[in-house]
Design a protein with these regions (language model features):
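Phosphate/diphosphate-binding loops
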Residues: 1-3, 131-153
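Intrinsically disordered, low-complexity basic tails/linkers immediately adjacent to helix-turn-helix/homeobox/MYB/SANT
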Residues: 123-138, 174-186
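ATP-dependent carboxylate activation and anion-phosphoryl transfer catalytic cores
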Residues: 1-117, 121-127, 134-135, 163, ...
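C-terminal amphipathic alpha-helical interaction region
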Residues: 142-145, 151-186
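Conserved small/polar residues in nucleotide/adenosyl-binding loops
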Residues: 187-194
């Protein structure tokens, strides 16, 4: 996943709306074995003090206000879409307003569903494994479950949920890469080769 780095945190007087004018000062790229996890990693990599789709709080907006806010194309749009999903606005309605493909809206919904599950269900090993599979960081899981980050880490370690590094196949398996690069993910099975 690639996300442009839009430095509105530094240029606070700049208009946040996105048009054809160049406003990005760079980009972040993240790699995971699923889109949701890559999106979560990319959001955290923006270095804008965000760690999940709740980092910008739009919960006070009514459904009508969210529908209007969805029309604004800016750097906070993904967070508005997440809040619209939380408030029950249909994927089709979000698509009609934003013209964003339903596939992407569904992936954002998977992340909001995990937030909801972490807030409302007891934290089981299976729920923790699923949250880690889609790259929810320990601090976010702790915040949503009301536990401490140390409790989450201990639960992870006790259940064999640990980091592994996978190589990116840059040569499409035609030949061995001379300068391979790797990405990290948390594995929940005994073997990282599953």
């Amino acid at each position: 996943v690639k996300i442009p780095r839009l430095p509105f945190d530094k240029f606070i007087s700049a208009k946040r709306t996105l048009t054809t004018q160049m406003k990005a000062t760079g980009e972040v790229m993240s790699i995971c074995n699923n889109f949701e996890g890559a999106l979560m990693k990319a959001i955290r990599s923006l270095e804008q003090h965000v760690d999940c789709l709740r980092s910008y709080d739009f919960s006070a907006l009514s459904v009508e206000e969210l529908l209007e806010r969805l029309k604004i194309v800016d750097d906070q749009r993904i967070y508005v879409i997440a809040e619209a999903i939380r408030k029950g606005i249909s994927y089709e309605q979000i698509h009609d307003i934003t013209k964003i493909d339903l596939w992407f809206i569904d992936k954002i919904a998977i992340l909001t569903e995990m937030e909801h599950a972490l807030e409302t269900q007891p934290l089981t090993v299976d729920l923790l494994k699923e949250a880690k599979r889609i790259e929810f960081p320990d601090n976010v899981i702790a915040r949503l479950t009301g536990k401490t980050e140390e409790e989450i880490k201990k639960m992870r370690y006790d259940n064999g949920i640990k980091a592994v590094y996978k190589m990116v196949d840059t040569c499409a398996a035609e030949f061995a890469a001379s300068t391979p690069y790797y990405y990290c993910l948390l594995y929940t099975s005994p073997s990282p080769r599953d």
